[in-house]
């Protein structure tokens, strides 16, 4: 697989490394991820039986989803380029007494080239909108998964509504995320992600929207994919 070793923005790594101490604070900078995580995990469980499975969590950060996966899967590997976030993830997994998690500081391109067709399940949540070449990430993810394996992506659509809700609303009004977390030009339409996936030999199984209710501060699945959405693919 032809790959680039610089498929990341240094300012993105710096940004996430600076707020490392807040990864496991449910009321801190990653408040929205803590609220969203049960929905993401349930979505994965509804589509894939995780027991006995080997999973890879791409862009794992502080390990919020990684730890959830480890409560069901046989072995989970979390990879990220943010060294400080991985340090937090490793310490927290020890506190949680989860011994079936491995963390590695690596790009998905490098990791999956070394571990081709290694995983049954791969998750790449809220990451694609933070890299220069998301199509390359999708291709690398496919390389690391076995034929018949499951891949899950979540990201944000690119349109006026998503700009108003995911950036203006979430970052500046509701303060669910730190200001500057997302750049509009880096957001991804579902059709674009599906096109990249098809090039990577991935078949779309499900596309679901994720809606936020600010009154009771909860996320739920919906048919509306105009802002946040998740996609489930099978390889082959």
Name these PLM-found stretches.
Residues 155, 175-192:
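Acceptor-substrate binding/catalytic loop of class I
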Residues 25-44:
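Conserved SAM-binding loop and adjacent beta-strand
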Residues 24, 170-179:
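Short glycine/proline- and charge-enriched loop/turn segments
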Residues 41-48, 53-161, 190, 231-235:
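Conserved SAM-binding loop
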Residues 185-200, 207:
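Short alpha-helix
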Residues 218-236:
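Core SAM-dependent methyltransferase catalytic element
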Residues 162-172:
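Short, flexible, mixed-charge acidic loops at enzyme active sites
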Residues 1-24:
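N-terminal, positively charged/glycine-rich alpha-helical extensions of SAM-dependent methyltransferases
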């Amino acid at each position: 697989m032809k790959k680039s070793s610089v498929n990341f923005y240094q300012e993105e790594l710096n940004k996430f490394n600076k707020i490392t101490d807040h990864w496991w604070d449910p009321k801190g900078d990653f408040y929205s991820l803590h609220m969203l995580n049960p929905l993401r995990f349930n979505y994965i469980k509804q589509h894939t039986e995780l027991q006995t499975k080997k999973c890879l969590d791409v862009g794992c950060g502080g390990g919020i989803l990684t730890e959830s996966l480890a409560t069901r899967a046989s072995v989970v590997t979390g990879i990220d380029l943010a060294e400080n976030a991985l340090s937090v993830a490793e310490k927290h997994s020890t506190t949680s007494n989860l011994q079936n998690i491995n963390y590695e500081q690596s790009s998905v391109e490098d990791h999956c080239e070394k571990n081709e067709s290694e995983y049954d399940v791969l998750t790449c949540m809220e990451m694609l909108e933070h890299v220069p070449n998301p199509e390359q990430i999708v291709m690398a993810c496919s390389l690391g998964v076995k034929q018949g394996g499951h891949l899950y992506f979540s990201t944000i659509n690119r349109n006026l509504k998503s700009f108003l809700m995911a950036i203006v609303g979430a970052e500046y009004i509701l303060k669910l995320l730190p200001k500057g977390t997302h750049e509009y030009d880096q957001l991804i339409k579902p059709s674009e992600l599906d096109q990249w996936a098809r090039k990577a030999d991935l078949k779309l199984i499900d596309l679901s929207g994720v809606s936020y209710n600010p009154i009771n501060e909860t996320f739920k699945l919906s048919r509306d994919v105009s802002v946040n959405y998740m996609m489930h693919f099978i390889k082959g």
